[in-house]
Amino acid sequence: MRIAFMSWRDLANDQAGGSEIFIDRLACNLLDMGHEVAHLCGGPVGERRYEVFDLGGTFSQYAKAPLIHHRTVRDWDLLVDVENGLPYFSPLWRRKPILALLLHVHTDQWALRFPAPLAAAGRFTEAKVMPLVYRRVPFVAISDSTADSLVDIGVDRDRIRILSPGVDAPAVTTVQRSTEPLFICAGRLVPHKRIDLLLRAWERVRSVVGGRLVVVGDGPERDSLEALAGDDVEFVGKIGEQEKWRLFGEAWLLLHTAQHEGWGIVIIEAGTMGTPSLGFDVPGVRDSIVDGVSGILADSEDDLVGRWIELANDRPLREKLSEGARLYSARFRWDEVAKEFAAIASDAVGSGIR
């Protein structure tokens, strides 16, 4: 098959995150399976194993997308339209099969990023207009929580397939757990990740258990978060793959304080190294952590602090969760994910629905 992805960012973008990783890993594995792959996305773009077409700026790309699509992949078998809040509305201008891929419905995230009038318009477009325009298009959701959110905004459940991301093979295979309490969080430093909440909780935990908190990742909130951070917090920014896996292997626990997610890729990555996670019982995170098996889900900030202290002081419990995290994470491998995606794509092409 000839499969074209269309999304608003490439991995070369400074703000690239889980969505961009998902597309790239899928694309590379589909290439290995013999499919032809292209990616249409907003700039900046980088060189990839597959062809990448620059759609333009953050918002101008939505106007350019139909024109560039028609010049490049108009006759391709399938367009995978990646929904990132503001839709491309591809069913209005493409005449061949479409598959919509959605990581999460943004809901309250609109208000975190935009002023009230724009946030209301964005939320209305995603929740009311998008389901209407895409009413015949099949969807792929990356978790049960995302599928539930799609149903809530009017997408038929029988049009939704669930496909969770995989993880790469670790660049480090030997785990050398830290002898002192070491805790890690990893991800983009943006409002919905709630790193400010994590730093508040850390002040309460540190006074009881000691140790260090390492914050991996970058983003627009970094300066303000560094100013907010107390003692024994280290911001390391973006790091290489080998360093990432080394830190996952050394850490006692991964902290994930996001308000919501589509899926927690870093939770599964940490689990690959036998590192359990502690997060909130919210969409996406609850799909990535099996409560009491691969980590712990907290109900509130106070509960998070209490469970964090409990896990830091209870080595047998950490070891039990470590083994559970390793076993659960072993279920998610990119080659298997790509095979399942190829089957879903084939069904979409065969149906002829657009």
Describe these PLM feature segments:
Residues Q259:
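Aromatic "clamp/platform" in nucleotide-sugar-dependent glycosyltransferases that forms part
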Residues V140, T173-E203:
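Conserved donor-binding/catalytic core segment of Leloir-type glycosyltransferases
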Residues D223-W245:
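Nucleotide-activated donor-binding/catalytic signature segment of Leloir-type glycosyltransferases, i.e.
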Residues I267, P276-G279:
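Short hydrophobic beta-strand element within catalytic cores of glycosyltransferases
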Residues L118-F139:
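Membrane-proximal helix-turn-helix segments that form the acceptor-binding/catalytic region
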Residues L317-R331, E340:
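A short, well-ordered alpha-helix in the C-terminal region of glycosyltransferases
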Residues S145, G166:
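Carbohydrate-associated surface elements
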Residues D291-D302, E310-P316:
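Conserved acidic donor-binding segment of nucleotide-sugar-dependent glycosyltransferases
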